[in-house]
Amino acid sequence: MNIAGYIDHTVLRPTTTLADVENCCREAAEWGFAAVCIPPPFVKRTKTILEPTDVKVATVIGFPFGYSATEAKLAETVLALVDGADELDMVINLIALRMGDWDFLERELKLALEIIHSKGKIMKLIVESGILTTAELETACRRFGPLGIDFMKTSTGYAEKGAELDAVKNMRKWLPPQVKIKASGGIKTYAFARQLVEAGANRLGCSASVQIVKEAQNG
């Protein structure tokens, strides 16, 4: 398994520096990761660094808690696209989800999707599967999957739980086949990364990416 091709090499700490991002880009180019996932202020610089490579530039919207006003999320989305983002990982409004306001969530998602897809870019919807009930996760998959999202992503990495095998398996069962899955949060070893892919993950959000690939190479 070419695990590197599944990885979004991630640096999203609140204290992230330009040097951190530049190092992330160098590692991504060297190891052949699918994308880097970096904070919005660094998108333009990252795009310039990675222009000669096949590595995609991913960033986050409404991160990490998702309860920004819709207008703020859409403004972030537009700016990220202008700066050169290829993929946008948007956090769902968990307050609205917990209150059962599924219609609001669908409206917000459709507005973001319209902007992102009009530029031919990729949307990943972060749902924080680790803090949802099984019923909430199933409803999210069945309602949002058919709307045109490209990926559903398990976690921000800031909740109590990150990627879990059962969640990925359930998401694969409940989502339309064309919707991919990104597992993220707490992926530290090649063994776990491989298990997640075998469970149905198409992409992995990792900060321990180099360590994981080295483990894979060493068997």
Name every feature range the model reports, one short phrase each.
Residues 1-31, 35, 43-63, 67-181, ...:
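Alpha/beta enzyme core
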Residues 38:
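N-terminal beta-strand-loop-alpha-helix module at the start
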Residues 184:
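Short hydrophobic "strand-cap" motifs at the C-terminus of beta-strands
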